[in-house]
Regions:
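N-terminal interaction modules that seed assembly of large macromolecular complexes
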Residues: 24-67
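Charged, low-complexity surface segments at secondary-structure and domain boundaries
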Residues: 55-61, 74-78, 136-139
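Non-catalytic effector/regulatory segments
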Residues: 20, 30, 42, 81-85
Length: 168
């Protein structure tokens, strides 16, 4: 019985971390575009969220969550964020991943680049297209080149632009 509590704790910790990480990004999108119909079925959005959920759930549990527990984190996080059936959204995301959906994979790649840049683990980061674009925009606006501001610009140039293009 103690083992079950351990798994529950990891799922809870992972879900809390996943929701806390993505909520400000979703909030920014809702502020600018409302909550577009179909956002919780959009391949790019789901890929971006799944990768973000995975990253923060693994960080929060020190890598001790995977498999079905991670799937439960996805379902719980989607339920909390969307007020819809998170398990259904997770099944769709799983299908998109299995089908190698190009938009889903782009969302995953963008979220991975942002997460790795934040952790300073992105290989050849100066030449990564999203980082380079964010730095060019920051320089053009004469903004600070602090890492946190580059991360914010990366989110705008990837997730926010994608939402605007699809739903704006």
């Amino acid at each position: 019985m103690a083992t079950m509590g351990w798994f529950d704790t990891h799922r809870k910790t992972g879900t809390e971390a996943a929701v806390a990480a993505i909520r400000p990004i979703i909030g920014m999108a809702q502020h600018h575009f409302g909550t577009p119909a179909g956002i919780w079925r959009d391949p790019y959005v789901l890929g971006f969220m799944i990768r973000t959920f995975t990253h923060y759930a693994k960080l929060a549990t020190k890598g001790k969550i995977s498999g079905s527990d991670l799937s439960r984190v996805y379902a719980n996080a989607f339920s909390q964020l969307s007020n819809l059936n998170g398990a259904e959204i997770t099944r769709l995301a799983t299908k998109l991943r299995q089908d190698q959906d190009l938009d889903f994979n782009r969302g995953v790649d963008d979220a991975a680049a942002i997460a790795c840049f934040k952790l300073r683990t992105l290989k050849d980061e100066q030449n990564h297209p999203l980082v380079a674009k964010a730095m060019r925009v920051a320089q053009a606006k004469r903004s600070s080149m602090e890492r946190s501001q580059i991360v914010g610009m990366m989110i705008v140039l990837s997730f926010m632009r994608e939402i605007e293009g699809r739903f704006g």
